[in-house]
Regions:
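Enriched for short, Lys/Arg-rich terminal
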Residues: 2, 15-24, 59-65, 69-91
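Generic recognition of well-ordered alpha-helical segments
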Residues: 11, 25, 29-32
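Short alpha-helical linear motifs
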Residues: 29, 49-52, 68-72
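A short, hydrophobic secondary-structure junction motif
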Residues: 31, 35-37, 86-91
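A short, surface-exposed loop/turn module that caps and links secondary-structure elements
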Residues: 32-58
């Protein structure tokens, strides 16, 4: 699976790299898990609704969520598009 960050999500990820190694590690673990099983596992994966329909979220912490969308066929042709990794998707 390929992993792609939106510009916004990449900036958020770099914020964590600079400020909190524990959260950075958690995000990396979630991304690794998503690459093997996008819709099940830790972080309580849940499909989002309304304007984010088609996207999923996983809990990074009590406050922060990883928001992503998976497209393509299983395996090498799949891509995970990460659009957020800081704050809650309603914020």
């Amino acid at each position: 699976m390929n992993i792609e960050f939106s510009q916004h999500a990449w900036e958020e990820f770099n914020f964590w790299v600079q400020t909190d190694p524990t959260v950075t590690e958690r995000i990396c673990e979630l991304i690794d898990e998503i690459s093997h099983n996008p819709f099940k596992g830790t972080g309580k994966p849940e499909p989002l609704k309304f304007s984010l329909q088609g996207y999923w979220s996983r809990r990074i912490t009590g406050e922060h969520r990883l928001v992503y969308k998976v497209e393509g066929k299983n395996g090498v042709d799949q891509t995970c598009f990460i659009i957020q990794c800081r704050f809650h998707y309603d914020d």
